[in-house]
Amino acid sequence: VWFDFPADPALMPALSSAIDGKPMRLAFLSSDRPEAVAAQHRLVKRYGGVSPEDAEVIVALGGDGFMLEVLHLPLARRVPIYGMNRGSVGFLMNDFSEDGLTDRITAAEHAEIHPLTMTAVDSSGQSFTAMAVN
């Protein structure tokens, strides 16, 4: 499964590399867990890596809490996220494997999420709006 938000197709080049035969532009983000950090280094060495802003897909390495953290990033609104379990729970994550990553991403089931947005006003009267993902 890979997650993304509804978006204007012109703003979301998701998985276009898989269609035109170019290497997929992947950004690898990891939680602070040692096994996640080690996996990130191995995957970058094997598949290359780009900044999250230049990625077609963000690969999140950690557990469910880290997936929720990545979903809160502003760039998550325009880049699909493929999670691999390197945490303790992993209910939202795919099984971890270093092999065939781009094929697994291309074949993954797409899950479009529609989070609620929340607006709150603090005691000084300043308004804040955020996504409610959890």
Language-model-derived ranges and their functions:
Residues 4, 8-20:
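Short, positively charged and aromatic/hydrophobic N-terminal segments
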Residues 86-89:
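Short, acidic/turn-prone active-site loops that include or flank metal/cofactor-
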Residues 78-82:
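Proline-centered loop/turn at the N-terminus of a beta-strand
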Residues 65-70:
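Short glycine/serine/threonine-rich phosphate/pyrophosphate-binding segments
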Residues 91-134:
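Catalytic core of DAGKc-family lipid kinases
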Residues 18-48:
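Short, charged N-terminal beta->alpha structural module
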Residues 47-56:
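Short acidic low-complexity segments
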